[in-house]
């Protein structure tokens, strides 16, 4: 294997208040079992990279949507209510922000990342830097 690409989630950011999120933000306080499984996925990939000296790239997806999406997600609920002429319930006075990513864009991004493994870089301290870190 030359390059391990794996799916993670924005859920790993847990209760972080600062937005936008950064790959440098702490992700050691998952607030759900789903977030904990994604964080453990990242830790396993990190270990695999160190043990077998191969690059790993984790892609943290944010609210993926598309034609076969989950009906319990907000965007489906909003669309359904709009079609029925019903009121959409808004929280936080409409000040909430959310990133939505269309599934076809996810697929294209994954394929592009799979096509080219990143070059290994070593920092001044001799330790690997991302994506090998």
Regions of interest found by a model, annotated:
Residues 1-64, 107, 113-114:
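N-terminal Rossmann-like NAD(P)+-binding domain of SDR-like oxidoreductases, especially those catalyzing
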Residues 24-26, 60-62, 91-96, 127-130:
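Short linear capping/connector segments at secondary-structure termini
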Residues 12, 69-70, 88:
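Activation segment of protein kinase catalytic domains
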Residues 4, 88-89:
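A short hydrophobic/small-residue beta-strand
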Residues 31, 61-72, 92-104:
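Glycine-rich "substrate-gating" loop/helix at the edge of Rossmann-like oxidoreductase active sites
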Residues 19-20, 71-79:
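A glycine/serine/threonine-rich, flexible loop-to-helix segment
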Residues 50, 76-88, 98-133:
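Alpha-helical substrate-binding/gating segment
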Residues 16, 28, 70, 82-83, ...:
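A generic fold-level signal
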